[in-house]
Amino acid sequence: MPYITSQNAAITAERNWLISKQYQGQWSPAERARLKDIAKRYKVKWSGNTRKIPWNTLLERVDIIPTSMVATMAAAESGWGTSKLARNNNNLFGMKCMKGRCTNAPGKVKGYSQFSSVKESVSAYVTNLNTHPAYSSFRKSRAQLRKADQEVTATAMIHKLKGYSTKGKSYNNYLFAMYQD
């Protein structure tokens, strides 16, 4: 849980910085560089023109994933950390590697992302939920909660993960039941 909490703290700091700059007219070179870095990491297309910053997309992506939701999903995906994938690859979420980016080190599970640490696995997972096109509806639902001034919780978000599993809603129901226990 400390890794999830620290990841969310870093995201919150970036989000708060973005919110504080949203109506700023003048940008220093350091601020522009920071904004460019954030946009790149969150896969947000931006021309570099500070008058045309895609604020809605940025704020939709630069946001937390509820800690208890990430912990529940890690437990479900890794068999409470006992799976071969978790033990050998530090991969708690069953994240597959992309074509051409797979390394097949001895003792590792082939075809799946390998992480140097659990912290790196958590970071990659949170980034995936915040950037991958498949989770766009998840991010839009979270943004709607923000707009309605409601808290972003695991209870509110687990069922918003459309397309996360080939099992569909039954997997979301499984996660929700696991979270409730």
Regions found by a protein language model. Give the residues of each.
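Catalytic cores of secreted/periplasmic lytic hydrolases that degrade extracellular macromolecules
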Residues: 1-72, 76-181
